Amino acid sequence: MGRKKKKQLKPWCWYCNRDFDDEKILIQHQKAKHFKCHICHKKLYTGPGLAIHCMQVHKETIDAVPNAIPGRTDIELEIYGMEGIPEKDMDERRRLLEQKTQESQKKKQQDDSDEYDDDDSAASTSFQPQPVQPQQGYIPPMAQPGLPPVPGAPGMPPGIPPLMPGVPPLMPGMPPVMPGMPPGMMPMGGMMPPGPGIPPLMPGMPPGMPPPVPRPGIPPMTQAQAVSAPGILNRPPAPTATVPAPQPPVTKPLFPSAGQMGTPVTSSSTASSNSESLSASSKALFPSTAQAQAAVQGPVGTDFKPLNSTPATTTEPPKPTFPAYTQSTASTTSTTNSTAAKPAASITSKPATLTTTSATSKLIHPDEDISLEERRAQLPKYQRNLPRPGQAPIGNPPVGPIGGMMPPQPGIPQQQGMRPPMPPHGQYGGHHQGMPGYLPGAMPPYGQGPPMVPPYQGGPPRPPMGMRPPVMSQGGRY
């Protein structure tokens, strides 16, 4: 085999030492940069061709190739692409390229070695921190278990020594509470054995469970329980000891139905008069209840807003939580009661005021905001029924119930004509007449007035007549 042919050089321009990927591109470059007439901008193929063109066409002589590096401006050299380049220049070019390649290889090797070194160093460093991390990880666990003994018994022994040398069980209970970790440490203190548990409870309970201990006022019980069993019992006793817990629901009905149900019953059971229960229910914080019982005295103070328990006087009517229902212009229509002062600020004649048997409160239904029951009373269904009783107060159902003279105990039979409109007011009157019996019926109406109202209205007055409206109302309503 013959000797290997010399490696072909990458296309490059002899005039400007510029490299190109393809010889065609090189030719285009030469024609545009080096062989272009500066007068007519005609692109020629070689240097001599450019000189001849300028001489013949423009009568000018060109001594050098334009845009060429110094020393390579010879216009007589006929170079076309890679052809025509002097051999010595070609050799020099090869030598330069070889040097460049060698240098690049060396750099690559150095870079590779550097990368390997970096990798090794990184690996070593990564391995080093890993062992360190576990150690650090172990340390925090030790401290954590020490602070909160609960997380793990195994952690306690290591953690306890730093906290306080001494009997592990006893000391851990004390430190958590003492350092001022009541929120987090309380349970842990509770977990501690009875011996340590008792001391921590006394200092710790105030921050952790202040209300239970003072309100029940039974610190000895908590101590005894703590002694009897681990501190775990201590925490439960506090919540259980909170006797007032049941009271809040009674005094503050958060929900209309439940609140009304609970408050009236409890109030009735208590020595407080039915009026108080009415006031409690009336203050149920919801429009449906508030509208009917806007101007009721509120000694119980079921409202979240401050209620003057004893002075339930003229100030009470404006107090109803919902202004829309309490739009009252003090009218002289005061119920016949010694407590006339309270209902003194009753709503205008428009709003129907239903006087209850309790004679301590006045139920008010403003005309502007018609409750669901009132609307239902105005429906044609009930208007049909009205003729039977002999009275057709359909036009003013709200007033009808008021005139309905609920005060007469049963009152319902007397107001047979009024009965249809009564549903809305009957509910409220019902509270006073039969607190236990009517409350359940009345409560649902607030939450779901339509279904409960008809049965309720019909039930008390006359079973036959009352039963029909419920069916009709339910069918029409739903």
UniProtKB/Swiss-Prot annotation:
* Disulfide feature: none
Chain intervals for the UniProt region annotation (GLEBS) = 359-391
Gene Ontology cellular component terms for the protein in this record? cytoplasm; kinetochore; microtubule; nucleolus; nucleoplasm; nucleus; spindle; spindle matrix
Polar residues bias: start-end ranges = 127-136
Zinc finger regions typed C2H2-type: which residues? 11-34, 35-58
**SMART domains recorded for this chain?**
ZnF_C2H2
What's the protein called, per UniProt?
BUB3-interacting and GLEBS motif-containing protein ZNF207
Q: What's the source species for this entry? A: Homo sapiens (Human)
This protein's assembly is summarised as: Interacts (via GLEBS region) with BUB3.
**One MF term in GO for this entry?**
heparin binding
